Design a protein with these regions (language model features):
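Periplasmic c-type cytochrome electron-transfer domains
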Residues: 3, 7-15, 27-721
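Hydrophobic membrane-insertion alpha-helices, especially the h-region
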Residues: 19-27
């Protein structure tokens, strides 16, 4: 059955769809209701933080260049790579109740993604000491075989056992009793959708997710010969995994033919959409942050005002200096609060978190995650709070990784000292005002002639790059930066939303952004856009750090600028850097409208029947999927992905979409004819779009007016960062 026939079948039952949609709304609202006062599993079991001891052994000694760490720093690195904070409960829940998308246990099975292809396909780091399995385990799963035991000191009851993939830990499922064992079939688990989409299916393992999943990656100055088989010495703890394929990792069950498949397929490698759960109704994946020079970031941090539930976090003050990690600066309450929020965002205390928002679809309004409630009712929260200070201590030890120290790195530098000297001057006069943590005196404007003279002297100091964060860590309006605005308009941290307690009053008081113009790719006109959220907070980007810029391409906050080589060797990184930096400084080389994420196939809105109310299950096809609508090939992904219609807009859209699909079916229109009919809906779709900014590689035009020789000189200096 082709897409148009499928659309036609949906149209014949459109009355049932409309009625079912109402049931679905009620169903989701009920599912999101808070019932009683939830506590986490550890609290329910009568455990305390003493039941979750920290690991004192230097488990990962060869990593990060073999640096010597204090006992506090060792415990911090161990927690960063191993501690899942009880989120195995959330990811097991997600496998049973994510509309047939998420299943981490299946993703780890070699029948889905073989170990010898894991880095290429998924971008994940295989754990040293494992090999591909030669036979299934006792549950019929083909998980990696461990050939070298983990170092002593890891309590599997607390940290799980290794899966063969760094950051993913396996815990016995407490619900896997004798009845569950009798119903378990490892073969059907992989191949039978009706079996593995059964909400009552109990898996033998829960999978915990540690921060290392997204942050451990090949060390640029000691890359593995084979990225599918790294040694511990080839890995860096917090550089940010710019190779991860988030869609395939966290939604391995997503099926072709559905819009969600197309949306994830368009997502750049090395990016993560941390506001997909809880959703902010903007598809805004962004590059995973590297973490370096935390001490310098603390030194230059600006003061921000705190209020409300934020002050329930121990150590918070009414006003304090705040370094940031998130691109938009929404994590504005200090290191401890920012780190704890990340753990919640990946599933800690999901018993409470999931009562505050409607996961994935977001049909019900969000409620704030209250710090005071978590402190009282979650042992995992308190155990994590005991760890975040040690994690921060470890971060303070992480230094930049220089090209000159990488194998063959010196061959990529110019030997012309005049060119290098000119590059320093160009940087001083055009870049350092934003991209340096060493700044002019407070009474000197860095953009003034006096400020530029100050930077010329500073940049030529041999110690200028030492402990320089290469950013002033200040937020600027997206109207100034002009990069794609989707991440800047994230709303989860605004007042009353899920991360309300984790953003400062200073963040919430930022001036709203107005006067935006975005390209309408359908008629090539520019339209004025007024953000729906008129309160303070969204609409800003922090200055990106240029630390390790030679190793971190593609560039920009969304990894949209430059070629993704998938090659962590020095040559592979430099190929990506050279392509990206040329496109940054010579914008005529960019893809422009070619960077718009588009559907590569005709598709439909698609849900597995097992995850919807009974009234909607009747319209599922033979493949078990409910397909509604027809989305043409080449549709901008974010035309659909960023929809957040008001009630009135939803009614208009529903009527017009129904009429269009009915006409397509009645006249048996071709794919081209159907596309032409659906294009008429674009004005309504744009009006209901929370961020209709579709061109991904735009913006940051600073320095593009330099001469070619100055640009080349600047590039040479950037390689030294």
């Amino acid at each position: 059955m082709n897409a148009l026939q499928s659309a036609g079948r949906s149209i014949k039952t459109v009355g049932m769809v409309v009625a079912g949609a109402g049931c679905l709304l009620i169903f989701c609202a009920i599912a999101a209701c808070r019932q009683g006062e939830p506590v986490d599993e550890a609290a329910a079991a009568g455990l305390t933080t003493t039941d979750f001891p920290q690991i004192t052994a230097d488990i990962f000694k060869p990593m990060d260049g073999g640096i010597e760490l204090s006992s506090e720093e060792i415990m911090g690195r161990n927690a960063w790579i191993l501690w899942s904070a009880g989120n195995q409960r959330f990811w097991d829940f997600a496998a049973r109740d994510s509309y047939g998308l998420i299943d981490l246990l299946k993703m780890l099975d070699n029948r889905k993604y073989p170990r010898e292809q894991r880095f290429r396909i998924l971008g994940l780091m295989n754990e040293p000491g494992f090999r591909a399995p030669g036979k299934p385990d006792k549950f019929g799963l083909w998980l990696d075989d461990q050939v070298t035991p983990e170092p002593a000191g890891i309590d599997e009851k607390v940290y799980g056992k290794p899966s063969g993939v760094i950051g993913f830990r396996l815990f016995p499922n407490p619900e896997f009793d004798e009845q569950a064992r009798q119903q378990w079939d490892g073969g059907r688990f992989m191949h039978d959708p009706a079996y593995y989409n059964n909400r009552k299916l109990v898996r033998p393992y829960r999978v915990g997710v540690a921060c290392g999943v997204c942050h451990v990656a090949p060390n640029p100055v000691n890359p593995p010969e084979n990225p599918e088989s790294p040694g511990w010495e080839n890995l860096a703890s917090a550089i940010g995994n710019q190779y991860i394929n988030e869609g395939k990792v966290f939604a391995c069950n997503v099926e072709k033919g559905g819009f969600f498949y197309e949306m994830l397929a368009a997502q750049p490698r090395g990016t993560s959409d941390t506001s997909r759960i809880a959703t902010d109704h903007i598809n805004n994946p962004n590059a995973i942050n590297p973490i370096f020079l935390l001490g310098e970031r603390e030194r230059i941090a600006a003061r921000e005002k705190m209020a409300g539930g934020t002050l329930d976090l121990p150590g918070e003050e009414n006003e304090m200096n705040v370094p940031h990690i998130l691109k938009d600066g929404g994590d504005s309450i200090g290191i401890a609060g920012a780190a704890l929020r990340v753990y919640v965002n990946i599933g800690m205390f999901s018993e409470y978190w999931l009562t505050l928002h409607d996961k994935l679809i977001g049909l019900t309004p969000q409620k704030p995650f209250e710090i005071a409630y978590a402190r009282k009712h979650s042992v995992y929260w308190r155990a994590t709070a005991e760890r975040v200070g040690k994690i921060a201590a470890f971060f303070r030890r992480l230094k930049p990784l220089h090209l000159k120290d990488a194998p063959g790195g010196v061959s990529f530098f110019t030997s012309d000292e005049t060119v290098m000297a000119r590059g320093k001057t160009v940087f001083a006069e055009n870049c350092a005002g934003c991209h340096s943590s060493k700044q002019t005196p407070s009474d000197v404007d860095p953009r003034s002639p006096e400020g530029k003279a100050w930077f010329r002297t500073a940049v030529n100091d041999p110690g200028f790059l030492d402990d320089n964060f290469l950013s002033n860590d200040r937020p600027y309006p997206v109207t100034t930066i002009k990069t794609n605005s989707a991440r800047a308009f994230a709303t989860n941290a605004v007042a009353g939303h899920v991360w309300d307690n984790f953003s400062s009053q200073t963040y919430k008081g930022r001036a709203p952004i107005e006067g935006l113009e975005f390209l309408n790719p359908f008629d090539q006109t520019h339209r004025t856009f007024k953000p729906r959220v008129t309160t303070g907070g969204p609409g800003y980007y922090r200055t990106a750090s240029l630390i390790n810029v030679w190793s971190s391409a593609p560039l920009l906050h969304n990894n949209s600028l430059g070629e993704f080589t998938g090659d962590p060797s020095v040559a592979g990184r430099m190929k990506a850097f050279n392509d990206a930096i040329e496109k940054l400084l010579w914008p005529e080389k960019r893809l422009g409208q070619g960077s718009i994420w588009r559907t590569q196939n005709e598709c439909a809105l698609q849900l597995r029947k097992e995850f919807v109310p009974a009234i909607l299950q009747k319209i599922a096809g033979g493949d078990g999927c409910i397909k509604i609508g027809f989305i043409p090939k080449g549709t901008p992904v974010n035309l659909i992905g960023n929809l957040e219609p008001s009630v009135g807009q939803l009614a208009v859209l529903q009527a017009k979409i129904t009429a269009a699909l009915t006409k397509i079916h009645a006249k048996n229109l071709s794919s081209g004819g159907a596309t032409a009919e659906l294009i008429k809906l674009v004005p309504e779709l744009l009006a209901a779009n929370k961020c209709p900014d579709f061109v991904e590689d735009e913006g940051h035009y600073f320095g593009t007016d330099l001469s070619d020789s100055d640009k080349r000189a600047l590039i040479e200096f950037l390689k030294t960062f």
